[in-house]
Swiss-Prot record:
Its main location: cytoplasm. One of its GO terms (biological process) is chaperone cofactor-dependent protein refolding. It holds the Pfam family Cpn10. This is Co-chaperonin GroES. SUPFAM superfamilies: GroES-like. The gene is groES. It comes from Clostridium beijerinckii (strain ATCC 51743 / NCIMB 8052) (Clostridium acetobutylicum). GO terms for cellular component: cytoplasm. Keywords: Chaperone, Cytoplasm. InterPro entries: Chaperonin_GroES, Chaperonin_GroES_sf, Chaprnonin_Cpn10_CS, GroES-like_sf. GO terms for molecular function: ATP binding; metal ion binding; protein folding chaperone; protein-folding chaperone binding; unfolded protein binding. Belongs to the GroES chaperonin family. Together with the chaperonin GroEL, plays an essential role in assisting protein folding. The GroEL-GroES system forms a nano-cage that allows encapsulation of the non-native substrate proteins and provides a physical environment optimized to promote and accelerate protein folding. GroES binds to the apical surface of the GroEL ring, thereby capping the opening of the GroEL channel.
Length: 94
């Protein structure tokens, strides 16, 4: 992958949705909840505010939760990624 996000943008790769519910029900492709957990694969340099660059809060390798309909989906070398603003990331999963 060779995507270099600009500004305060982040490239994420979605983690797979659960195949089964906690009670053991197997979900089909259309019944699965759209995943909101992803791994950060690239991070931009950060926004410039009043002439100063603001450091990014996420880093490559972080697992994050993000807004359900945030970002733009792109396909590179057969892999699907989402490019979104750091503000669309809700939390880092530790």
């Amino acid at each position: 992958m060779n995507i270099k996000p600009l500004g305060e943008r982040v490239v994420i790769k979605k983690l797979e949705a659960e195949e089964k519910t906690k009670s053991g029900i197997v979900l089909t492709g259309t019944a699965k909840e759209r995943p909101q957990e992803a791994e950060v694969v690239a991070v931009g340099p950060g926004a410039v505010v009043d002439g100063n660059r603001v450091a990014m809060e996420v880093k490559v390798g972080d697992k994050v939760l993000y807004s359900k309909y945030a970002g733009t989906e792109v396909k590179v070398d057969g892999e699907e990624y989402t490019i979104l603003k750091q503000d669309d990331i809700l939390a880092i999963v530790e």
